[in-house]
C-alpha cells in the first residue's frame, strides 16, 4: 500500500480558475456535449425510423452514431468536471470504469470511420461487386469488430493495469495522489494504444482516400474523354459530380478525424519517452479536441447527404409520429 505525502494539502487540490472562468468552461463544454448528443441521436432516430434508410451502409453509420452518442452521454459529462475542476471526485473504481469506457468508445468511433472508408472504397472503385461484397453480413462483422476489439483492449488493459507496468510509482505520485483520473501509459502500452486506436485505422483511412481520389479522378477523366468524342460534353458532369462528391465526403471525414485526434495521440505516445513532461491540462484539452470528432460526424452527414437534411426536418417538426411516416421517400 502506497501513502500519499502531504495528503491533507493534496486532497484539496482543485481548479485555481475563477468562478466566471469555470462557469464559461462549463457552458462551452456543455454545448459540445449537447451538440454531440442531439446530432447523433437524430442520426440514430432517422436510420431506425425510415425504412428507406435500412441499408447495410447506413447500419454502419447507425452503429457509429450510437458509439458517439454513448461517448457524449457516459464519458463527456464526467470528463467535463475533471477538466474544469482539475480534480476527480468520483472514486478510484469509477475512474477505471470511466477511463476504460472512454478508451473503448473513442477507439470504436475511430474504427467505425475506418470501416466506413472501406465501404466507400468498394462503392466508388468496385461498384459492380459492391453489393455482393458489402452485404449485411459483412457490415455485421465490421460492427462486431468495431465494438468488441476496443472493449477487450480498453477494459483488459485498464482493469488489469497493464498500462502501468513499470511506471506504477510514477502513476501513484503524479496522478493518484493528486486525485487525477486520465489515461496514463508506459512506453510499451502507449505505443500499443497508439497503434491500435489511431495509427492502424488512420493509415487505412488515408490509404483508402488516396485510392478513391485517384481512381475517381481517373474514371471521371475517362468518361469526359468518351463523351467528348461523341459530342456529349455536358453529360459528363453528372458522373463526375457523383464520384467527386464521394471523394470529398470521405476526404472531409478523414481531415476532421486527423485534425481532432492527431494532437492527442502524438502527445500520448511521446509523453512516456519525454519523461511525462506534458502537463495534464494540455492532455485534457487535446482529449476534448478528440471528442469533437464525435460532434462533427453528424455535421458531415448534414452537409453532404440530402436524406439527412430531410430526415432532420421531419424529426424536428414531429412528422415521424404521423401514420406511415416510416415509408417516406427521403431520396429517389
From Swiss-Prot:
The keyword Transferase appears for this protein: no
Keywords on record: Cell membrane, Disulfide bond, Endoplasmic reticulum, G-protein coupled receptor, Glycoprotein, Membrane, Receptor, Transducer, Transmembrane, Transmembrane helix
Glycosylation sites: 9, 16, 283
Summary of the tissues where the protein is detected: Widely distributed, but in low abundance, throughout the brain. Highest levels detected in the olfactory bulb, nucleus accumbens/olfactory tubercle, prefrontal cortex and other cortical regions, midbrain regions consisting of substantia nigra and ventral tegmentum, cerebellum, and pons/medulla. Among peripheral tissues, highest level observed in the liver, less expression in kidney, gastrointestinal tract, spleen, pancreas, and heart.
A family per Pfam: 7tm_1
Coiled-coil region: none
Disulfide bonds: 4-177, 95-181
Transmembrane segments: 25-45, 59-79, 98-118, 139-159, 188-208, 250-270, 288-308
Intervals, Cytoplasmic compartment: 46-58, 119-138, 209-249, 309-332
Membrane topology type: Multi-pass membrane protein
Metal-binding in keyword set: no
GO cellular component: endomembrane system; endoplasmic reticulum membrane; plasma membrane
Role description: Intracellular G-protein coupled receptor for trace amines, which recognizes endogenous amine-containing metabolites such as beta-phenylethylamine (beta-PEA), 3-iodothyronamine (T1AM), isoamylamine (IAA), cadaverine (CAD), cyclohexylamine (CHA), p-tyramine (p-TYR), trimethylamine (TMA), octopamine and tryptamine. Also functions as a receptor for various drugs and psychoactive substances, such as amphetamine and methamphetamine. Unresponsive to classical biogenic amines, such as epinephrine and histamine and only partially activated by dopamine and serotonin.
UniProt-recorded name of the protein: Trace amine-associated receptor 1
Native organism: Rattus norvegicus (Rat)
Amino acid at each position: 500500500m502506497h501513502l500519499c505525502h502531504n495528503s491533507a494539502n493534496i486532497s484539496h487540490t482543485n481548479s485555481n480558475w475563477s468562478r466566471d472562468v469555470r462557469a464559461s468552461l462549463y457552458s462551452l463544454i456543455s454545448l459540445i456535449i449537447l451538440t454531440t448528443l442531439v446530432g447523433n441521436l437524430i442520426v440514430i432516430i432517422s436510420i431506425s425510423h425510415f425504412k428507406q434508410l435500412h441499408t447495410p451502409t447506413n447500419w454502419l453509420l447507425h452503429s457509429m452514431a450510437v458509439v458517439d452518442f454513448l461517448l457524449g452521454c457516459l464519458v463527456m459529462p464526467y470528463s467535463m468536471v475533471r477538466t474544469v475542476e482539475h480534480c476527480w471526485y468520483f472514486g478510484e473504481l469509477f475512474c477505471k470504469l470511466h477511463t476504460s469506457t472512454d478508451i473503448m468508445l473513442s477507439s470504436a468511433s475511430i474504427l467505425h470511420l475506418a470501416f466506413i472508408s472501406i465501404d466507400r472504397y468498394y462503392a466508388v472503385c468496385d461498384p459492380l461487386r459492391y453489393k455482393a461484397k458489402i452485404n449485411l453480413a459483412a457490415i455485421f462483422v465490421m460492427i462486431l469488430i468495431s465494438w468488441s476489439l476496443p472493449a477487450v483492449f480498453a477494459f483488459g488493459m485498464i482493469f488489469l493495469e497493464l498500462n502501468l507496468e513499470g511506471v506504477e510509482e510514477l502513476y501513484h505520485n503524479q496522478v493518484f495522489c493528486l486525485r487525477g483520473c486520465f489515461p496514463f501509459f508506459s512506453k510499451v502500452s502507449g505505443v500499443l494504444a497508439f497503434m491500435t486506436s489511431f495509427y492502424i485505422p488512420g493509415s487505412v483511412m488515408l490509404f483508402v482516400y488516396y485510392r478513391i481520389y485517384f481512381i475517381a479522378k481517373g474514371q471521371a477523366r475517362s468518361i469526359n474523354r468518351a463523351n467528348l468524342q461523341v459530342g456529349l460534353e455536358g453529360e459528363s458532369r453528372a458522373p463526375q459530380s457523383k464520384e467527386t462528391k464521394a471523394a470529398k465526403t470521405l476526404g472531409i471525414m478523414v481531415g476532421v478525424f486527423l485534425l481532432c485526434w492527431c494532437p492527442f495521440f502524438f502527445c500520448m505516445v511521446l509523453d512516456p519517452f519525454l519523461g511525462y513532461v506534458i502537463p495534464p491540462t494540455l492532455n485534457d484539452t487535446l482529449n476534448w479536441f478528440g471528442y469533437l470528432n464525435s460532434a462533427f460526424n453528424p455535421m458531415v452527414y448534414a452537409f453532404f447527404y440530402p436524406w439527412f437534411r430531410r430526415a432532420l426536418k421531419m424529426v424536428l417538426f414531429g412528422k415521424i409520429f404521423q401514420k406511415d411516416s416510416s415509408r417516406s421517400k427521403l431520396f429517389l
